């Protein structure tokens, strides 16, 4: 979990409003979902609101849902396997 001091430091550096994601926490929650749902359930990341998380999610989820040529281009740029889109 991000410390308050780090959040304040980032807010001063980048201004607000801003989006801040704790990637370790995200990975932990995805892993917890996998454990709860079991091996028969495959996770798909819908990248609509957060396309900048594609690289971080590549190893965590099974598939990526794209709804536009731009989203597809992001997956290509991040070298997501075509079979996973």
Regions found by a protein language model. Give the residues of each.
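A charged N-terminal "starter" segment
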Residues: 1-85
């Amino acid at each position: 979990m991000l410390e308050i001091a780090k959040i304040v430091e980032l807010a001063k550096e980048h201004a607000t409003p801003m989006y801040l994601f704790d990637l370790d926490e995200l990975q932990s929650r995805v892993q917890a979902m996998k454990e709860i749902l079991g091996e028969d359930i495959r996770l798909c990341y819908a990248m609509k609101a957060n396309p900048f998380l594609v690289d971080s999610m590549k190893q965590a989820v099974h598939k990526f849902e794209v709804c536009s040529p731009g989203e597809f281009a992001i997956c290509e740029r991040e070298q997501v396997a075509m079979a996973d889109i």
